[in-house]
Structure formats: structure tokens, C-alpha cells
Amino acid sequence: MHGHLYIILKESIKYIPILGTGMMFYGFIFLSRKWATDKERFTYRLKKLSTPHEAAVTGANPKGLNPMWLLIFPEGTNLSDNGRKASTKWAEKNGIQDLRHALLPRSTGLSYCLQELRDSVDYMYDCTVAYEGVPVGQYGQDLFSLRGSYFQGRPPKSVNMHWRRFAIKDIPLGDEKIFADWLLARWREKDELLQQYIETGSFPADGGFGEDENGKKVKGAGLIETEVRTAKWYEFVQVFVPTAALGLLMNVVFKLIGMVLRVLHLR
């Protein structure tokens, strides 16, 4: 069971009509990019996620924790023209080389998440994403917008992902500088992965043999190709049902308030 999904996003996204309301309804974590403020939000939300529940859902682990995914973007924003400029400026300010196909990561938020969750979470998964059909120098967010993908029928032909898994016990969390260097090294590896995708049209696939955490010999899955689609045509609509219901409820409440005020005014 995949369990719950929580996404860490920049605060401005929650003000998007309908979508932003839905994200707040589902408990997503919004950040202001001011650590003094964000640390309190992180502490509150992460404490809830790492607290055992008496009545955990089906699939809960032996620690009594509900299964969940916590998604964080250490870059803090989409790859775009403005994001590219900000990454270059950050690189110049810190005397480091900028990346070619990704944005430089910020380490503070991820480091705090891992430290708060390391007693309840064993692994961190790293995903590198590439969209088919994005020319070098252009950005996926400009070509595959929400409107173009869902309402104009122009989605990317394929979405390519490269996954890696890191044991949290092996990640250097004791020193902020060492962790920042470790994270930057992983991002330079991601930049090389994206370069290979540009040159070959695919990410490298692990088809060899290795060992799992128990020392058992296992074979890599290689390149996995699958098609993702909804089972029923109306499933996409169901995503918006909670937010639409909330919007209708708020509309009714405001109308009732307006009626009461008018009655009081007539008196």
C-alpha cells in the first residue's frame, strides 16, 4: 500500500484557486522560504507524521506508523528561466559551479526533514525526471502547461524517471557543511544523468546484480516501461470533488451571511 502522500511546496501555490484549496485540504506543507517561520511548520507537521497512531490504517509498519510518502524539492522551484538565473546567481555568490540541466539544491529543509524522521524512516528515494520533447535551452513548464496537457491534449509523449535509494543511516546528517557538500555531489550526479538522457534519449538502467540490505543477491530491474492511465474516465473529475464541495459549501455560507446582514439592515 502506498499510503498517504504529502508534498512540500512554496507558499504561493496554496493561493491558486481550487487547486491550492485542495492541497491545503489534503495536508500539504507550504513554506515561506524564511527558515525562522518554516522551521516551526516543519516541526509541527513532521512530528505528526512520525507519531505512532493507535488505529493505524491497513499496511502500517510494526512501529504503528501509517505508510506515507513525503515529497520535497530541494531546489525550491521549477526549472525555468527565472529559476536558472537564480541558480546561477546562487552559484556565483557561493563560489561554486552551476549545473547545466538542473537547479542547485538548498540543503536546510531536507536536512531537517531527515533528522526529524530518521527514527521512523529507513530510506530516502531520489527521483530525476526528464520530459520527452523538451529542446535544450527550453523548459518543460513552458511547453507542457496544465492547460496544454489537460485541456488542449498536448502532454509530453513520455515522462522518464531515474530512481535511487539511500539508507538514511548512511547520509551524513551530523554536520550541515558536510551534508550540503554531500547533497551537491548527488545533484551533480543528477546533472550527468540528465546529460545522458539528452544524448541517448534514456536514463541508464540497472540490469546487473547487487545485494539488498540483507546481503541477498538480487538482479536489477533494468529499464521499466509502462503506460499510466485512469481506469475510468471520471476518475480525473473525482480528484476535484473535495475542493469543489468545499467551494460550494463556502458559497452557501457566504450567501447565508449576506441574507442575514440584509435582514438586519432592513430592521
Feature annotation, model-predicted:
Residues 1, 23, 172, 259-267:
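Proteins with a high burden of low-complexity, intrinsically disordered sequence enriched in S/T/G/P/A and R
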Residues 1-139:
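Soluble catalytic domains of membrane acyltransferases
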Residues 3-4, 94-95, 144, 234, ...:
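Generic alpha-helix detector with strongest preference for long hydrophobic helices that associate
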Residues 10, 31-33, 127, 164-166, ...:
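Conserved beta-strand termini and adjacent loop/short-helix elements that scaffold enzyme active sites
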Residues 29, 34-37, 80, 175, ...:
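Intrinsic-disorder/low-complexity, polar/charged segments
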Residues 45, 49, 56, 87-232:
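Catalytic lobes of large eukaryotic enzymes
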Residues 221-262, 267:
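Alpha-helical bilayer-embedded segments of polytopic membrane proteins, i.e.
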